[in-house]
Amino acid sequence: MTPGRRSALLSRSVCGAIVLAVLVTVSGCASLPDSSTPQAIGTINRDSPGSSVAAPAPGREPDLLLRDFFKASTDPSNRHLAARQFLTPGVSGRWDDAASATIVDKVDVLPETRSADQATYTIRANKVGQLEPGGLYVAEEGSFETKISLELQGGEWRISELPAGVILDRAQFLNTYQRKSLYFLDPAGTTVVPDPRWVSGAQDQMASQLIGLLIDGPKAALAPAVRNELGDGVSVRGPITKADGRTAQVGVGLGGIRIDFAGVPPMDAQAKQLFAAQVIWTLANAEISGPYVLLADGEPFDERFPNGWTTADVASMNPFATSSATVGLHALREGSMVSVTETGVTPVPGYFGSARNMRSLALSQDGKLVAAVADTGRPAPEPASSLMVGAYEDGAASVLEGGAITRPTWAPDNSAIWAAVNGNTVIRVLREPGTGRTSVVNVDAGAVTALGATITELRLSRDGVRAALIVDGKVYLAIVTQMPGGEYALTNPRAVAIGLGSPALSLDWSTSDTIVVARAASDIPVVQVAVDGSRMDALPSRNLTAPVVAVDASTTTEFVADSRAVFQLNNNDPAGDRYWREVPGLTGVKAIPVLPG
């Protein structure tokens, strides 16, 4: 290990959930360097999965043959043909590989019975997820156990009895499958929203797979909250090719891509822009480069782009764009709001810069409005907290009071503020743009409050379609759904930071498909979590002093507050130079970083 880098051994509850450069083996935990960059759990294999899976090795002992079978099961091509080679002919014909796909780690193969030509083994493992149709990863936690029997046929062991469905070893799964996002539209049609999927196959098959999934539409939980311009009978005519019509190495390297759609209804220029944005960002973020030549029934999809589109043509809907670069970093310092620059801090004009009793605050996406939770100073049983709302450089008004109010969070269009009050009620504060008048309406959060007693954090994603929450120290993601009557609900909450090991203290959105979580642990206090719960990566802990009590993030930078200062972590720094740096003016004082959102 290089100087200046120490290893932190993960607790048993976290091992297998937080993984960096070194994979967790089936028998133990990995040692994590503090200053390494986040890595995917596993190395993406760009080759076709089938090319790396061999036929059963001759003379293999039954327990080793089972491990080879699990490895082969990660190749789904031809109805898991690679795995069927390990079965007896009769069982191969009956095996229902499509029944389920269970993802496990720490697989133990334990002998049950053994004779000269028969053997039965108990398979025990930690269950970490399910892979559902359409490549949907569902994070789960629990134990897995099943029995598999083998018999000797022609001098070779083959599986003679096994459960329906496939068992996927996590490390092998992550070597074979790739996580890619489909992009749908937010309700207002202002940005694209990710829907992560896990796909398998060579890179030259990727475009066809992703466009097919995009046409099939969003997952059921997300469907009420997004739009899909590729629905209603849209299909692809003929093969997807390179931009010049070549059919080899499509989506690999340069040369662009050409897709001819059928069934596209009449569209105005704006609808065509949205349609193209879905296609382009889905392909671009899967490392399939343009130009993107889009056709409809053999003719240019949009006459403005006969030679193809580029990401610049749909840049306004870039899912990785951030407003924080223009608004800048702010902080809550000793109860007051300050603007932060490279040279220091400056109190902002108006109420928010002069008040000394604020506990948390949030800036609107455009930086023009502020919402803050202030200490009322009144003794119990009077409300201890007040939600204050006002313009950035102006006064503020109290819109509601409560015993406890979470850090506010702004809707993307700056029209509403969300917060949880007293741990079990979620509200929206609506603000009229012209008059500044406010009204408070409840959000249907029954699906969330059923998960636990107390909501301590609520953060809306920058596209406004998801909400990240901490409930009783656990991390959940819910879908923000507008109901037919106009009211809002938090629906389909799912635990995503399974195996976190310590209670979550704070969280924020880094990208539209990644959140950053501060947890109550000294060894690895900050982690990144994928929205589908498929991965959890440790961020460096060098220079941090636990506990980390607050986190705010953008697509380029994470900010945290520990027990003595505010620190920043630049995602663009080289791996060897990536560590937390103190923010000038926010050292040795009680301060919390604040970015728009």
UniProtKB/Swiss-Prot annotation:
Major subcellular site: membrane
Signal peptide: 1-28
SMART domains per the UniProt record, alphabetical: Germane
The keyword Transferase is assigned to this record: no
Domain of life: Bacteria
Gene Ontology terms: cellular component: plasma membrane
Stretches the record annotates as Disordered: 38-58
Cell compartment(s), UniProt: Cell membrane
The keyword Signal belongs to this UniProt entry's keyword annotation: yes
SUPFAM superfamilies reported in the protein's UniProt record: YVTN repeat-like/Quinoprotein amine dehydrogenase
Positions where lipid (S-diacylglycerol cysteine) attaches: C29
Biased amino acid composition, Polar residues: 38-51
Keywords: Cell membrane, Lipoprotein, Membrane, Palmitate, Signal
Disulfide bridges in this chain: none
Lipid attachment residues per UniProt (N-palmitoyl cysteine): C29
UniProt topology in membrane: Lipid-anchor
Family, as annotated: Belongs to the LpqB lipoprotein family.
NCBIfam families on file: PRK13616.1 (NF010141)
Protein name: Lipoprotein LpqB
Species, as recorded: Rhodococcus jostii (strain RHA1)
Source taxonomy: Bacteria, Bacillati, Actinomycetota, Actinomycetes, Mycobacteriales
Gene: lpqB
